[in-house]
Amino acid sequence: MRIGASDLDVCRMGLGGNVFGWTADESTSFEVLDAYLHAGGNLIDTADGYSYWAPGNSGGESETVIGSWLASRPARDRIVLATKVSTKPDRPGLSTDNIRLALE
């Protein structure tokens, strides 16, 4: 499925990464990501705020796990990665500063 007028072609079912680094540890997350890729999936969704709400987490755990997975697999050119800017208690709203911090 083509996204708008872009040259991005994604499968109809994306994989949400909100559990990676939280209820799914890195090993389990890698297994899920491998299975999704093997089944023909190519659209992975995440956000910088994923799992900040879990004890011991600060947000970004999902992005970190997905980044580690991408670095360890020859699949980067086959994946479309979608992310979002989140608000967290210490970073409310969508100010320029919050967006800049989320990108880092």
Describe each model-derived feature in a short phrase.
Residues M1-V80:
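N-terminal binding-site loop/beta-alpha segment at the start of enzyme catalytic domains
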Residues D77-P89:
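A short, structured active-site edge motif that brings together acidic residues
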Residues T87-E104:
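Glycine/proline-rich, positively charged
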